[in-house]
Amino acid sequence: MARNTAINRYRNIGICAHVDAGKTTTTERILFYTGLSHKMGEVHDGAATTDWMVQEQERGITITSAAITTFWEGSRRQYDKYRVNVIDTPGHVDFTIEVERSLRVLDGAVVVFCGTSGVEPQSETVWRQANKYGVPRIVYVNKMDRQGANFLRVVGQIKNRLGHTPVPIQIAIGAEENFEGQVDLIKMKAIYWNDDDKGTTYREEEIPAELVDLANEWRSNMVEAAAEASEELMNKYLEEGDLSAEDIKAGLRARTLASEIVPAVCGSSFKNKGVPLVLDAVIDFLPAPTEIPAIKGIHPDLADKPKEQMEESDYDERHADDNEPFSALAFKIATDPFVGTLTFVRVYSGVLESGQSVINSVKGKKERVGRMVQMHANQRDEIKEVRAGDIAALIGMKDVTTGETLCDPDKPIILERMDFPEPVISVAVEPKTKADQEKMGIALGKLAQEDPSFRVKTDEETGQTIISGMGELHLDILVDRMKREFNVEANIGKPQVSYRETITKDSVEIEGKFVRQSGGRGQFGHCWIRFSAPDVDDKGNITEGLVFTNEVVGGVVPKEYIPAIQKGIEEQMKNGVVAGYPLIGLKATVFDGSYHDVDSNEMAFKIAASMATKQLAQKGGGKVLEPIMKVEVVTPEDYMGDVMGDLNRRRGLIQGMEDSVSGKVIRAEVPLGEMFGYATDVRSMSQGRASYSMEFSKYAEAPSNIVEALVKKQG
């Protein structure tokens, strides 16, 4: 079967933003204008098409990234048909994992900002994540009809706060209730939207006299930005003093794909003024799958090789080409009440037909692909095949987790994995009735499979089930989903902070010896280990996990016992050395020891290594670390003193303050343990007028009174 749409006419894009910048409404309008949805859903009446989980509709925030396939021929039917796969991403800090995993599989992004509040904390997080994956993007400043909206002020904030170069290709005509449309700086025409067809079409007129000078100023800024794309364009510009519309688009496109600039447009999705031009900008400036670098991967045999030891020759590439071996990345798992598990994949290369088998190269397991569907929010169309560049959902996968690779069994590859943050908050859950115990286990297992930033474990001492996640809202919603989707009522304990431990000494040599010899077969394990504190980067982030090396010479400890020593260290790291919390990172080198011909075995060496690791509390300068959150509070000036005093009482460090449309923005770093229930406190302090957001920043040493309490608790 041939391709319906040439791959150079694919656009895989995400719509990212801060909560309430109007992202879901923008996605709704995209569905409407691309002809998929005949009734526009409004978020505030709980009817938006992409917000298809019950809680999303109730809370008015987007939680899961729904992937939608649409087609676009241009606001003036000026293009051949393009296939646009849109992923709607959540903007709430507790769901950054959803944003991260969507950005991983996208080729370009539309970042939506509110015309009034501009660059908000979460926008910075999303921007950093897009930088991390090198995602080219365009900016859409929405809500231009709102009080205090100002397009060029937001453009300035993007430059100053995000350190990127925005290039407006429009300016706004009017603002707030007088917002009428845009000046198209490429055509130098004023654009006014037709209310009769809900802003599907527009008329072009001359630019209003009072905006001509401003339009000329920003046009020359745009033309210069385009000219800098190449020597050829620069020479043309210097000779002729201007560039044609084609040259401007080509220059801006080249620089956007290189992530040097960000084209900026404005509008009001709610008032139906501007979204078709956002779609035009997606076609004009964002990349096709063939215009981004080929994805890299490694052969499954090299899966255990440490990243720092990898050589260029260890990597393999997959290009966006139907003739290459099939490879795809599972970026989301969702449970559907009718068909079971949906595995959302981004296909990077090759072709897959339903009924064929693929291999999950991470687990080494074969999977048969039953049915395949293309999603339109929560409706689905069955398809017979997927090709390079496609985003689709596979039905019938038995054992696939987010971030794993599905590929051709004859040409296996493990594509670059996603990094998932460690949870920072835990609560105990127990079913309200004994009968729900088993159901709760199944429900939590399914939710953990869908969301890698959510963990479930059983506390060995208390037998309680502990769930961990990225914030209070994250866990609230998962407990809520358990109730709605699996009919499991649960009681929730008090939130617990995920403390960590580390050591501070840079080189300490410790002996571990485990000997039991009393007639018959005994136990003998003896090793010397040099422990060092983990590496810390400029921002205070600690290298996680164990970096283990073997420097034993002369066979004083036989080779077959070395993995047992590593295992013993790793197991003790999980249980901590000071107060029972996991060691965040450690460097360990085994360099000496001894063995017994008869009594030595793996278990003895594992215990010896564990005993050596335990001594780090005293000998290695063991410390307890607490998670520190980056907190941003937006408050009217009247309540600023109270808010700051309260943050100080919570052991917060004020990092800075600035003015915003809604008052003052206070930025601080506060220990997570002091932030429980903050939502209620900050509301009562400000009579409901202050809002805040927080995200994980780093781990830092906990004060001695907290450590004492934790050690006491451990008994």
UniProtKB/Swiss-Prot annotation:
Recall the GO molecular function terms of this protein's record.
Answer: GTP binding; GTPase activity; guanosine tetraphosphate binding; translation elongation factor activity
SUPFAM superfamilies hit by this protein: EF-G C-terminal domain-like, P-loop containing nucleoside triphosphate hydrolases, Ribosomal protein S5 domain 2-like, Translation proteins
InterPro entries attached to this UniProt entry:
EFG_II, EFG_III, EFG_III/V, EFG_IV, EFG_V, EFG_V-like, EFTu-like_2, G_TR_CS
Task: Tell me a GO cellular component.
Answer: cytoplasm
In which residues is GTP bound? Answer: 17-24, 88-92, 142-145
According to its UniProt record, which protein family does this protein belong to? Belongs to the TRAFAC class translation factor GTPase superfamily. Classic translation factor GTPase family. EF-G/EF-2 subfamily.
Q: What is this protein called?
A: Elongation factor G
Taxonomic source organism: Ectopseudomonas mendocina (strain ymp)
